Design a protein with these regions (language model features):
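Membrane-proximal envelope and lipid/glycan-remodeling enzymes
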Residues: 1-245
Length: 245
């Protein structure tokens, strides 16, 4: 919703929805950079001679909703935990029992490898064992990432003109997001343990739609990827709610 209203140049709603998302997933604060860039770009499209300072003076009220939501979160955190930035995460068992804290560079390598690991093979040709937490092969669980990476490379070669800033910004934000996630002690449950990673998908999907090539071949290839991704996540949903994984 934040991205949708940003593209509609409705900054108040865009920043308010972004604040809601950050309240749930603080790491999504990174994408505020993208939203502000797009809002400035949209303003300058309507006002070619306009400046960032003029935008601030004219649209200052855009931050009211965002600020109100942020203050409400901080007030709730203070009332519950005596700290405006603490929302209960540090009180979870996995964080109270560790000496290395919630975030630490020592987690980075292992967590990155978790996002590459394949399902474990069963003994004597038994069934594959899928992980239910802390990540697994991102390209297997969300094959749309394959399309996103491919489209980015295509656009870098074919569509640089007029897109260069976003072609640089989006992957940098995604990589920064990934590194922050992987410096977190846990990668979470659900979506085969890829829940945190999937938070970046709306923003990457925006890039995909913006840069994708035209033509039937692109559609045909992605139909195969769509069917594969849908099938494995349908199986995962059934398996999860039946407590098979």
């Amino acid at each position: 919703m934040a991205l949708y209203y940003t593209l509609q140049n409705k900054g108040g709603l865009a920043l308010a929805f972004w604040a809601c998302a950050v309240g749930c997933r603080p790491m999504l604060a990174l994408y505020g950079i993208l939203l502000v860039y797009l809002l400035v770009k949209g303003y300058k499209k309507e006002n070619p001679k306009g400046t960032v300072w003029q935008l601030v003076k004219e649209k200052w009220y855009w931050v009211i909703g965002c600020g109100a939501i942020a203050i409400s979160y901080m007030a709730l955190n203070y009332a519950r935990f005596g700290n405006i930035t603490e929302f209960g995460h540090n009180y979870l068992p996995e964080f109270t029992r560790t000496k290395t804290g919630q975030f630490n560079l020592s987690y980075l390598r292992e967590n990155l490898m978790h996002y590459l690991r394949l399902p474990a093979a069963g003994e004597n040709g038994g069934a594959l064992s899928f992980f239910s937490s802390d990540g697994m092969a991102f390209w297997l669980i969300a094959p749309i990432f394959i399309t996103m990476i491919g489209v980015w490379i295509y656009a870098l070669v074919k569509k640089r003109e007029g897109n260069l800033t976003l072609l640089i910004m989006l992957p940098l934000l995604a990589v920064a997001h990934l590194l922050i996630i992987c410096c977190h002690k846990t990668l979470g449950g659900w979506q085969f343990g890829n829940r945190y990673l999937l938070d970046m998908m709306p923003y990457l999907f925006f890039g995909l739609v913006l840069w994708k090539p035209k033509g039937e071949k692109f559609v045909q290839w992605n139909t195969v990827i769509l069917v594969f991704g849908f099938a494995i996540n349908l199986i995962g949903t059934v398996a999860t709610y039946n407590h098979w994984i």
